[in-house]
């Protein structure tokens, strides 16, 4: 089995469905004997360019290990899911299990927001 990194972008109006979508894709992978090494929900982010007149979308990254038939099934699911605006599947040499640079940035932003909220609460 080969290692893959999958990033897919979901329509911002469908953000509440993302956890269910991730669960569905994880189930597809595991039922066919694949493994999931990392799943990261990057949340709503600014797009580099407009897609279907949208400036923001919900990003999800998955690092998996699976065979070609499972990958074909996942790609088919991405193509025929109207909520998925774009998807990218990249073959990797080995499994990536640590946080991605994007996830580190998301965590830094959350830490900044928490730090900014703390002094505001202390003053009130």
UniProtKB/Swiss-Prot annotation:
Pfam families: Ribosomal_S6. Residues 96-124 are annotated as: Disordered. Belongs to the bacterial ribosomal protein bS6 family. It comes from Burkholderia cenocepacia (strain HI2424). This is Small ribosomal subunit protein bS6. Binds together with bS18 to 16S ribosomal RNA. GO terms for biological process: translation. Residues 114-124 have a biased composition (Low complexity). SUPFAM superfamilies: Ribosomal protein S6. Keywords: Ribonucleoprotein, Ribosomal protein, RNA-binding, rRNA-binding. One of its GO terms (cellular component) is cytosolic small ribosomal subunit. One of its GO terms (molecular function) is structural constituent of ribosome.
